[in-house]
């Protein structure tokens, strides 16, 4: 095989399903947009939560996204029939799991400090690393187990650290909000595994449409008794909630078009300092050093997981001796 042929083969392997070639600058740009809009989603959710329940926020968040998507599809001439799937029950099942995760996240958002929420939420890649081998047949490696143990040690530090440091004067921070944050991480884990499976057969738009329709219907059915029309400036926060969450998911998907997950994921961790800053500056939340230590352990666990994934991809893409002739 010639050098030129090898280069062309490598470029073809790096090219993704959309036909786009890797572009680091665009990947970084879209990831930063995602990081910012996810933080704005949390801010809007906190403000909306002063006037409505978490279930109502899930409804407005997804109903607004649904309207935007339908208008965009009409404008672009995309037929809804083209978004249908031969696996509707699996799509609904995945969407239902994500609905539970989104509701848990919204509930935790109203109950615990933002640094605790974002730190516990970011344990979901570690759950994926442990459970994907069981559900998708991926390899369970020692680095994956080590990464998960580091992350879960971080969770223990976040929950029990303040109690240990104070000599028992401060009660453990495990509460309904903490339970909801951990629950959302587990639900997001199963959602990620389901998405990995479904993307083998369906487009991202199909998955997104099933999600927003499912969430809008479920949230309305479960929360219609407390559902109220937003009044005054609350409309601005509700619109911000729906628009920013849709932009965040779209931007993250676009980032993955131009770069692999092992490139995008470390940049996504910028959400942690941004959420911490939001909590401290806007809501006067206290930043406890021991909680920060737990957060760093979660980050370290994710870092090991990303390093292992990068190493695996490099090994799998390396040409064999026979192929290099």
Model-based region annotation:
Residues 125-149, 226, 273-292:
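C-terminal transmembrane-helix exit sites in multi-pass transporters
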Residues 117-123, 198-214, 249-280:
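Helix-helix packing/entry segments at the starts of transmembrane helices
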Residues 165-227, 317-325:
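Transmembrane alpha-helical segments that form core, pore/gating elements
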Residues 2-8, 26-27, 51-100, 187-191, ...:
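Transmembrane alpha-helices of multi-pass small-molecule transport proteins
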Residues 26-34, 79-104, 175-184, 229-247:
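Loop-to-transmembrane-helix transition segments
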Residues 1-30, 129-182, 186, 299-325:
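Juxtamembrane helix-loop boundary signature in multi-pass membrane transporters
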Residues 56-59, 63-64, 109-137, 261-278:
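Specific alpha-helical transmembrane segments that line the substrate/conduction pathway
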Residues 12-18, 66-86, 155-170, 215-236, ...:
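Membrane-interface helix-cap regions at the ends of transmembrane helices
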